Amino acid sequence: MAEIMDGIIFGGQLEDFAGSIHKEDSKNISMRRSSGGHKIATFLRQNGYEIDVVDYVHRWKIEQLKQYLKPIAKDCKFFGFGSTFFLDSPVVKELVAWLKEEYPHIPRVAGSQNDSMRSLDMDWYVYGYGENAMLELMKHFDGGPEPIHFNKVINCYVNYKSFPKEDLTVSYQETDFVNPREIMMIEFARGCKFKCKFCSFPILGVKGDYSRTAQSVYDEMSENYDKWGIEHYLVIDETFNDSSEKIEKFANAIEKLPFQPKMTAFIRGDLLASRPRDWDNLIKMGITSHFYGIESMNHKAAKSVGKGMNTGRIQDGLLEVKEYFQTNAGYYKGLISLIAGLPYETIDSLRETVRWCSEYWSDQSYHMNILMIKLLGKPSLNHNSEFDLNWKDYGYRESQFPKDDIKWDMSINPFYKFLYEYVATSGEYIMWENDYTNMYDCFKFCVEEFSQAKLKNALDPFMYDKFFIDPSVKWSDFATKTHMERRESHILEHVDGYIQSKLSFASRV
């Protein structure tokens, strides 16, 4: 670490299913580092700036943060805060207030893909993929003109776009204290070629090959393996298998690595079922853990949101994929994601879906979300889905929840109750009904019936990091174990060790 830092970026996530982000004693620290923070740091370093990233910020004590910052912060050009989701935990709010008082001359910048960043008291906000916007801000901090903005919000979907981008490399430093058992996030492309009606992702309907170069992927994975021993990745692309040509491009590069990566990714199930030519290339890459956004096995319901493959064909195709990967890859994990409440979906058709999953997919994973429709009104940076904008055109009407008689104790997952209470009290989402079902009955079904489904392996492939930090856990365990505890002690041991290593290093600067 240089003695003079140009910027310090704070980031971190909490696994917050019950409001724990606002509790001082929260222990639900995510193993995941600040994806955007490290992306920005890498890009600014490539442009000549010295940037430090402070991960797991929710776990730090305010006195530890002060101790860490005092030797290195006085000449900073900015303090940054970045998170995919909420950042306003008590320690972060206290840190922001202290920075404002202690370093009033140093601007504070928050970046995110959603409106949550504006809960923090900042001088600037960077909305969207922010590499180029941050570079413009750095020029401004060096004495140049202000970037284009509205009320100090830089909209990176309009100005200073950083998509598509040929090089999406993240490069870690010695002062990041990387553990070889971490599951790192990796990005192959930005945006999605599809336009599913429930999707509120910001960049949809892209054309052509918008992915990064194969060489940059090879170089990033080689560096992470050579320096830190990293072999495991979570692919954060909206849809990875949108193009056979793209898959082949990356498979040919990754096959040359001196190790076999192990990765999990969002995979569109209907495309995978109809393109057997992609299967071996995915195996070459090590993408043998899949998250399938099937949404519904009611053909009319799936077709209404842009996924129209015949139900029998998608079911048979998924079973063929499972058998092929288990036979030829030696490892396979597939999670089917469903949405209760789509047009034409009834409670009875949901029961049929769960019966199929119980019979044919119980050795894997499946989960069911509730359709959420935002109540539009106050201005927000959040993107809106087609359903959010035009829900009445799809047969939805506003309703009210009846008296709550849901048997909440039947579900071991607290997420449903937290979501129900949020919808009922926040005023941010519509309590909807249509001609086929209503939101309340979907909650009741998910809690009282779906939660009782025959499901041997409930491990979400995107939650592996909470188990894998335990050295005794093998990658193959995720496909075979029927239940795994969160490994909280291992997570906190890693995070607390990271904090102590950062403090020790800063004390020597």
Task: Walk through the language-model features, giving the residues of each.
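Short, electropositive alpha-helical surface patch
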Residues: 64, 248-255, 345-363
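Structural recognition of alpha->loop->beta junctions
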Residues: 118-136, 279-289, 354-370
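Radical SAM enzyme core and accessory elements
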Residues: 1-9, 45-50, 62, 66-76, ...
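Flexible glycine/acidic-rich beta-alpha junction loops that bind and position SAM and/or redox cofactors
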Residues: 15-19, 114-118, 194, 244-245, ...
